[in-house]
C-alpha cells in the first residue's frame, strides 16, 4: 500500500489482541461495526451489553464487530492486551474480535482510524471525541455511517439491517 491510498477498509492489516497480523480482507462481504472501546468508561457497560445483543442477533447474517481498545480518553483502557482481553471476555462476555490497543487521534493514529475519519468526519471536527465512537462499514468495505459515543448501538439497528440487506419493510 506504499503510495496508493486505501480504496476500502479491506486494504488494511491490523494486529489482533495477541499481536498477530490480521488482514481486514478476511471480512470481505460482511457488514462491519468498528468501535474504539474502553473498559473503565461510563459508557462501557451499556455499549458492551448492546454490542453483544447485536452480535448475537446478526452474526450469522454477516455482522462482524471489530473492537479496538484505546487509552486516549482519560486513561480509561489502562491495561495491557492480556488484561483487556480478560476483562472484555470475562466481565463483558464479548465474543466478537478484540484487536491491539490503538491511538485513534494524534500523531500515532492507527492508519485504519485515519481512513475511517477521512471517510466519515465527525460533527465540527473529524477527531474521535470519546470512547465508543462507532463506524458502520458496508459488505464492500465502504464506510456508511459514523455514530457518536452517546448513540447506543441499538439506536442504529435499522441501519445494520439495511447494510445486511434485510431491512424489514
UniProtKB/Swiss-Prot annotation:
Lineage: Eukaryota, Viridiplantae, Streptophyta, Embryophyta, Tracheophyta
Induction (UniProt): By salt stress and metals. Up-regulated by salicylic acid (SA).
Function: May constitute a glutathione peroxidase-like protective system against oxidative stresses.
Keyword Disulfide bond: no
Keywords, alphabetical: Cytoplasm, Nucleus, Oxidoreductase, Peroxidase, Stress response
Family: Belongs to the glutathione peroxidase family.
A GO CC term attached to the entry: cytosol
Protein's recorded name: Probable glutathione peroxidase 2
Expression across tissues: Expressed in leaves, stems, flowers, green siliques and roots.
Family annotation (SUPFAM superfamilies): Thioredoxin-like (SSF52833)
Organism, scientific name: Arabidopsis thaliana (Mouse-ear cress)
CDD domains according to UniProt: GSH_Peroxidase (cd00340)
Amino acid at each position: 500500500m506504499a503510495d496508493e491510498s486505501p480504496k476500502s477498509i479491506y486494504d488494511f492489516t491490523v494486529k489482533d489482541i495477541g499481536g498477530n497480523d490480521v488482514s481486514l480482507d478476511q471480512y470481505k462481504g460482511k457488514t462491519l461495526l468498528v468501535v474504539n472501546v474502553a473498559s473503565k468508561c461510563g459508557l462501557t457497560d451499556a455499549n458492551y451489553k448492546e454490542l453483544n445483543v447485536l452480535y448475537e442477533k446478526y452474526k450469522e447474517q454477516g455482522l462482524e464487530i471489530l473492537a479496538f481498545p484505546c487509552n486516549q480518553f482519560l486513561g480509561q483502557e489502562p491495561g495491557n492486551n492480556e488484561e483487556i482481553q480478560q476483562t472484555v471476555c470475562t466481565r463483558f462476555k464479548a465474543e466478537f474480535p478484540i484487536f491491539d490497543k490503538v491511538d485513534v487521534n494524534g500523531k500515532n493514529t492507527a492508519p485504519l482510524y485515519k481512513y475511517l475519519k477521512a471517510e466519515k468526519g465527525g460533527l465540527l471536527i473529524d477527531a474521535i471525541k470519546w470512547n465508543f465512537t462507532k463506524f458502520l462499514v458496508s459488505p464492500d468495505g465502504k464506510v456508511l455511517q459514523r455514530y457518536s459515543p452517546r448513540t447506543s448501538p441499538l439506536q442504529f439497528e435499522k441501519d445494520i439491517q439495511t447494510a445486511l440487506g434485510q431491512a424489514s419493510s
